[in-house]
Amino acid sequence: MYVDYGYYIIRPCRCPEFLKDFSEWILTVSGCICDAEPQPFSCMTGDERQKEKYRKRLGMEKQEFIDFSEETLRLFGEDRLDTDSRFLFKQDAEDIYRRYFYNRRGVDPGYRLIGIALEEALLPSLEDRLIQKKEVSRTEERRFLGFDLLIWDISGFHTYLCNSLQEELMKRFELKPGRFGLLENSKEEMEAFAEAIQNRGEPVEWMPFAVYDDTPAAAEGSEIHGKI
C-alpha cells in the first residue's frame, strides 16, 4: 500500500549535461537538480540582496513577495512546510499554488504541484529524519507520472540521478524514463533497482517513491497547466 508522504511545487528543468540525455526534461524533488518552492530559508534570510534575487526569480511584485514570504514562514513555523519545501498537507500546497504559481502574470507557468508516496512499510525508515503527519493518507486516484529512487540526507531528498546511478542500473536493467525522467517501470522492477544500488552514492537507504501530478488543472481532468 502506497501512502502520501508530501507535496511539492516544482518546475521541471532541462536534463543536465552530466545525465547524458537521460530524458529531455527532469522532474524530481531533489534540490540538486530542480528547484522546489517556496524556499523557507530564502524567505527568512537577512541578506536583502539574496532575498531580492529570489523575488525576481519568482517574478513577483514586491508586495506579493512580502505576502508570499509571510505565508511561507507561517507554514514553516507551524511545521506544515519542511526545510526542503515539502508541504505536509495537500490543501496548503494547493492554496500556495493557486495564489502564487497558477496563471499568475510574470510567474513561470511551468510549475507543477506533485505528490510523492511510498510503501507504508517503509515509513519507519524516515521517521527520525522528517516531520511526520499525525495521520497518513492513502493515495487517491490521480495522474501517476512515474517512480523516482530517493534517499533523505540531512535536509532534503536526493535522487539516484544526482550520483549518475542510472548508468550502473542501465548495465543490468532496462530503465523506462518517461517525459520527465520519472521511471515507468513496474513496482517490482523499482524494488529491484533500489536493492541494486543500496549503499551506492550515499550511505543511506534508497527507496522507490511514486510521483503523482496534483496540479489543480490536471486534477480536474483537463490538460496539465503550463507549457514547458
PLM feature segments, named:
Residues 83-91, 181-188:
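Conserved aromatic
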Residues 189-228:
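Acidic, proline/glycine-rich low-complexity IDRs
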Residues 2-83, 101-111, 115-120, 130-180, ...:
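Short aromatic-glycine-(Arg/Gly/Cys) micro-motifs in beta-strand/loop hairpins
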Residues 93-98, 186-195:
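Short amphipathic alpha-helices within nucleic acid-binding modules
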